[in-house]
From Swiss-Prot:
Taxon lineage: Archaea, Thermoproteota, Thermoprotei, Thermoproteales, Thermoproteaceae
Pathway: Metabolic intermediate biosynthesis; chorismate biosynthesis; chorismate from D-erythrose 4-phosphate and phosphoenolpyruvate: step 7/7
Descriptive protein name: Chorismate synthase
Similarity-based family: Belongs to the chorismate synthase family.
Listed GO biological process terms: amino acid biosynthetic process; aromatic amino acid family biosynthetic process; chorismate biosynthetic process
Organism: Pyrobaculum arsenaticum (strain DSM 13514 / JCM 11321 / PZ6)
Function: This reaction introduces a second double bond into the aromatic ring system.
């Protein structure tokens, strides 16, 4: 389906080369300050137009808030946001019809929808559609701010180049002042060179990002079906190109003995907390007031300019294709912004589920 969430529900729509993409957000309380600038700020973070290899389409996001907002505040009714597609060049995809691109969703969509699916630009499976997710994430981040919570992410690996130096949450936020959100300047320089090299060779690279959520209240999540980690994993895998997820110290925990893996419980400001937080802020599927953090791994962009083997579905014969359209050398930076958004949406949904934020009455104005 195309809807995510329980109390805060988002429904996305549209295809890469259709007239528009968009999102309907239901469950936002009345009285939340929200402007077009709030949406634009997040959409602009997704662009990376200053690095041509990451966004050759570089489409300025022309959007409209169609409903649910009046005089700079939400009304408590569904918020509809439409984002217009302006720079699609569909002719690039004429020769690809009935020749599924390896690594793309083309084959799966053909098997499920037959000849009725829109293959242009990847259609519904395109990374372009994550712009709608990012727009919804802008609203969710405003909800998180009501309780003093914030979400931020950064790139930890790109094309085999890894960030190895230690860092803080403040370092993660400041990394967005750089060409790419990378806390290590040496790693950043190497990543930019990897992007340049692969663009010249007509290839692509994958990588990994890390998402942080700080200030999240304790008690969110359920013991079994509705665990906060399970819901966040569901959210993460809703973003195109995601192939794996590590929570907290992740696979490193699996290599430790129990005495090493356990986080000592200590008193922090008169309350119980964790001394080390290798577990990533969640125990038993429930938040405990510590920072949440997890890493998400993404495959390389399937569209490359190198010849690839496929099948001509009309003839059921082997075929070779070579993509000639525009493509991102790496989906990692744009996916990072979408993953931030899905994290914020999931946490805001849990805040509403738990009654931390109520929607049976207007929020105070101004919001505190």
């Amino acid at each position: 389906m195309n809807t995510f969430g329980r109390e805060l529900r988002i429904t996305t729509f549209g295809e890469s080369h259709g007239r528009a993409i968009g999102v309907v957000i239901d469950g936002v309380p009345a009285g939340l300050p929200l402007t077009e600038e709030d949406i634009r700020k997040e959409l602009d973070r997704r662009m990376f137009c200053h690095i041509h290899w990451l966004n050759p389409r570089c489409e300025p996001e022309e959007f409209e808030i169609l409903s649910g907002v009046k005089d700079g505040h939400t009304q408590g009714t569904p918020i509809a946001i439409v984002i217009w597609n302006k720079k699609a060049i569909s002719s690039y995809y004429d020769e690809l019809w009935m020749k599924p691109r390896p690594g793309h969703a083309d084959l799966a969509y053909y098997l499920k929808y037959g000849k009725f699916y829109d293959h242009r630009g990847g259609g519904r499976a395109s990374g372009r559609t994550t712009a709608a997710i990012v727009a919804a994430g802008a609203v969710a981040k405003k909800l998180l701010a009501l309780v003093g919570a914030e979400v931020a992410g950064h790139i930890v690996e790109l094309g085999g180049v890894e960030v190895k130096r230690p860092y803080t949450f403040e370092d993660v936020k400041k990394s967005w002042e750089k060409p790419l959100p990378v806390v290590d300047d040496d790693a950043l320089a190497a990543m930019l060179e990897v992007l340049r090299k692969n663009a010249a060779e007509g290839d692509s690279v994958g990588g990994g990002v890390e998402i942080w959520a700080v200030g999240v209240p304790q008690g969110l999540g359920e013991p079994h079906f509705g665990k906060i980690r399970a819901d966040l994993a569901h959210a993460a895998f809703s973003v195109p190109a995601v192939v794996a997820l590590d929570w907290g110290a992740g696979r490193q925990l699996a290599k430790m003995r129990g005495s090493e893996a356990n986080d000592p419980i200590v008193v922090k400001g008169g309350k119980p907390g964790l001394e080390t937080n290798k577990i990533g802020g969640v125990l038993g599927g429930i938040t405990i007031g510590e920072p949440l953090y997890f890493r998400v791994w993404l495959k390389p962009t399937p569209s490359v300019r190198k010849p690839q083997r496929t099948v001509d579905l009309a003839k059921m014969e082997p075929a070779t294709l070579q993509f000639k359209g525009r493509y991102d050398v790496s989906v990692v930076p744009k996916a990072l912004v979408a993953l931030e958004a899905m994290t914020a949406i999931t946490l805001a949904d849990h805040l509403l589920r738990a009654g931390v934020i109520r929607r049976d009455r207007p929020l105070k104005d101004p919001v505190v």
